[in-house]
Amino acid sequence: LAAALGLPFSFADFFGTTSEHGPLVAELYREYFRPSGYLKQPRLNVTLQVICAETQKKAEFIASSRNISRLESLKGIRNPLMSPEEASSIEITPYELKYLEKVNKHVILGTPNVVKEKILEATKIYGTDDVNIATNCHYFDDRLNSFELIAETFDLSKIVEDRSQI
């Protein structure tokens, strides 16, 4: 619809396994785009799910909350996102581990350099440099730290120093 109306298109790459089809969706948007009074060329935005931390181990620890939440949702359980301390203490079956490995292929997780490399790879795959980031984790400070690390590694001009303004 966005292509037919000549509007910008935003793709949520972070829902389930949508990233498997995202590049095709982006290609179809560009192929069927019709210029409008609003937009002369197609404009695509992609939102990626990212957790960035100082170490790979810490990023995986932070992501454990999200992982348990994903497993619970498969069982019809809807609880608030638990802490990573609680989540990492839960036993995971081999089947659940296999499921998490599959869905986590679509999450960018790691150190600043790893995250930067994967974000840049996604911009090439989608053919856009217009990227949003979704970070689903228990602690606000972990989310904020993730955003700050990403901003630093991309050398963005302004990083909020006074967290009380957020």
Where are these regions (language model features)?
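A conserved active-site cap/scaffold subdomain adjacent to cofactor or substrate pockets
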Residues: 1-26, 30
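Hydrophobic faces of well-ordered beta-strands that scaffold small-molecule active sites
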Residues: 9-13, 42-49, 129-133
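Generic C-terminus detector
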Residues: 123-166
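Short, solvent-exposed amphipathic alpha-helical segments in soluble enzyme
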Residues: 6, 64-68, 148-149
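Residue-level preference for long, well-ordered alpha-helices that form the structural scaffold
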Residues: 18, 104, 111, 139, ...
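Active-site-proximal loop/turn and secondary-structure-junction residues that shape catalytic pockets
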Residues: 15, 50-52, 137-139
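An alpha-helical appendage that flanks or caps ligand/catalytic pockets
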Residues: 20-126, 158-164
